[in-house]
């Protein structure tokens, strides 16, 4: 079905957009185009320096809007038996437009912390919804054996929620310029518990603390799924999330050690988004009951 493919493309496109957004900030290109939606009064500025990254980010964002509009229209045409998919797509379209407006506001008001972090938060919420739609419209051929009783769906969604919170906290670290508030690794200012004397140190420290706790929880979850479940697709995704969370924490430390170099910082954002999407995918494809099969998540043949 074409709508299923369009949702998958939208997920990948959103991940690319999040990566580009991080590159824009890491290269200090966020205000390279001082106006919005144009750039120096034109839609075709000279693509050099920071303008290249900022305007490329805007062009990719515009492309995502068009791509998801197509996905929504295809969902309307092809999912008559599952109307919730079209309704969710409409909500996603609204969310995407609001997120784009917040992108403009970050430029107009010159990067206020709250608006910039809201811009990132809405992008992550859209990614979560797009992943839900993409995962709900796939066909999984593997038969599903008896389940272990471990609440995979519930745990995956809870952890996805915490990954979202941690990502928003990371956005605050970025937009408050708190990335080097703790300049050493793994300690902070040479201490396990640093003096929380200002907002940048406090935000950075709690971002690290939650990262360690969340990484431990995700690794525990992945271990339980891999060894308790026998369904191959869910075991494969358990390995993926375990790898992602280890790489994510590593990149967080590398970002500090390299003084917030563009590539590790941008990959740090990308992997957080990939981890969020992977957990939502696991929760969505996992059958609701032992009698269910993966086919319940497949699109109807209409």
Region locations from a protein language model:
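Polytopic transmembrane helical bundles with strong interfacial aromatic enrichment
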Residues: 1-302
């Amino acid at each position: 079905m074409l709508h299923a493919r369009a949702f998958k493309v939208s997920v990948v496109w959103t991940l690319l957009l999040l990566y580009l957004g991080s590159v824009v900030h890491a290269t200090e290109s966020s205000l390279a185009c001082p106006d919005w939606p144009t750039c120096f009064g034109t839609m075709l500025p000279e693509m050099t320096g920071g303008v290249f990254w900022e305007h490329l980010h805007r062009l990719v964002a515009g492309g995502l809007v068009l791509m998801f509009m197509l996905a929504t229209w295809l969902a309307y045409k092809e999912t008559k038996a599952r109307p919730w998919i079209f309704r969710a797509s409409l909500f996603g379209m609204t969310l995407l437009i609001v997120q784009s407006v917040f992108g403009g506001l970050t430029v107009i008001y010159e990067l206020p912390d709250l608006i910039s972090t809201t811009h990132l938060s809405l992008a992550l919420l859209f990614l979560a919804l797009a992943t839900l739609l993409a995962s709900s419209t796939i066909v999984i051929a593997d038969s599903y054996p008896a389940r272990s009783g471990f609440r995979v769906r519930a745990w995956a969604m809870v952890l996805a929620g915490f990954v979202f919170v941690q990502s928003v906290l990371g956005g605050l670290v970025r937009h408050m310029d708190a990335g080097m508030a703790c300049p050493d690794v793994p300690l902070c200012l040479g201490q396990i518990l640093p003096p929380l004397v200002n907002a940048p140190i406090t935000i950075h420290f709690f971002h690290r603390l939650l990262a360690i706790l969340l990484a431990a929880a995700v690794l525990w979850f992945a271990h339980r799924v891999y060894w308790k479940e026998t369904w191959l697709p869910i075991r494969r995704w358990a390995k993926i999330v375990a790898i992602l969370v280890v790489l994510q924490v590593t990149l967080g430390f590398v970002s500090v050690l390299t003084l917030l170099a563009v590539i590790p910082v941008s990959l740090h954002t990308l992997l957080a988004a990939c981890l969020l999407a992977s957990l939502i995918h696991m929760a969505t494809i996992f059958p609701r009951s032992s009698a269910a099969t993966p086919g319940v998540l497949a699109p109807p043949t209409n």
